Amino acid sequence: MTKRLMTKRRAHNSVPLPRATRRDFLKHSALLAGAGVWYVSSPPVLALPEQSLNERLNVACIGIGGKGDGDSSQVARHANVVAICDVDDKRLDAKMAQEVKGIGQPFEKAGRYNDFRKMFDELGKSIDAVTITVPDHMHALATMMAINLGKHVYTQKPMTHDVWEARQLRLAAKQKGIASQMGNQGTASPKFREGVEVIQSGMLGSVKEVHIWTNRPIWPQAPKIMSRPPEQPVPPYLHWDQWLGGAPERPYNAAYHPFKWRGFWDFGCGALGDMGCHTANLPFMALKLGYPSSIEAEAGDLNSETCPSWARVRYEFPARGEMPPVKVNWYEGRKDGTLVHPPAELVEQVLSEYAKVPHDEKDKKSKKPDADKTPKLNNSGSIIVGEKGMLYSPHDYGGVWYLLPAEQFHDYKAPPQTLARNPKGD
């Protein structure tokens, strides 16, 4: 068992809140969760007050930087934001004064916290639901605490830092009877859902091969960083002990915060964990993929501190009902300075057909082939290869795609709708 998991499993009895250290964080996290932060306690579900359809929920937002800024502003359009929590005081200052179009300054009267344990201590009874948008290593700790207090949770992707954590959250959510969702914005796109329906309708025939790639990492990791960064002074606006949370203790370095923690094993999940949930979302949902029967991987610049500089991973999935076995290939990073991509022959075939797609059908985010230029593969996307055709998505989120060969699908008509749509995009 790794040191990281051991620290997350540890339970204590005393709770010294006033002066927060990392050790105190673990102690108090365990107590708030019940018998232990990772063990689902036996008391019945905490009942929430009955609310009418017109009554607004009281929501607390844990993490308000980056994606958390958008999540908190979005939820403020539909609920009362009663508390905001972040380890970065500069973010809190900006959020308290922020104006959201159409609703003014929804955060100016919200409770302000650096430590979500204290937030739950002081406002727990007035909180109905929580958004959690923090570094990966803290997803499970914050989410489990909220669940065990009977709060509904919206946790950003990836759901957790490892598989074991995800399984524990699933058990806790089921026992507590709360509503939960992982933030994965592409899933709400109408075009994404139509793509799922296209594949499941059989329009492409049986799918036996999928290729998914990303230009990530776009943050520093191997080969640039392959050992522990040296200690640096902690900025006065950053609460470093709270940022570390349940991770193994280490000194601060600007290499971690903000955003760049993704490439460190103790905090992030690398390119696959960061973008796989987006770029692989369409094929995984459409093909109803579960557990793979085998996984093969190769990667470069391996080390114990940071994620690899590049990788290729092949998953083999068994048949699912009438769907045949399928091989899913993942590509990330740069090898010898070149982005790792699907096989050249497949790429050439896809781009040749993509060039035939009428110009006005191409999305602004995709690379439109000019008359005198050869089209290039987008930096991220997916290719779903079926017996009757292919779906090419030059897009991170699967919300843009084209059916190839272009001539074969010239008169394309959408299949019957089987998935709900969100016309407002909320």
What is the role of each PLM region?
Residues T2-H152, R167-A179:
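N-terminal glycine-/serine-/threonine-rich beta1-alpha1-beta2 phosphate-ribose binding loop
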Residues S52-N54, A76, P106, L123-K125, ...:
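Extracellular/periplasmic catalytic domains that process cell-envelope and extracellular macromolecules
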Residues N58-I62, V82-D86, T131-I132, Y154-T155, ...:
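Structural recognition of the beta-strand scaffold that forms the well-ordered cores
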Residues G70-V75, A94-A97, A140-M145, E165-A166, ...:
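Short, solvent-exposed loop/turn and secondary-structure capping segments
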Residues R91, F107, T133-H137, K157-W164, ...:
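Alpha-helix capping and helix-loop boundary segments enriched in small/acidic/polar residues
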Residues H152-Y154, M159-Y237:
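A contiguous active-site-proximal alpha/beta segment in oxidoreductase catalytic domains
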Residues E194, S206, H211-P217, Q221-C269, ...:
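Contiguous beta-strand/loop segments that form the cofactor/metal-binding neighborhood of enzyme cores
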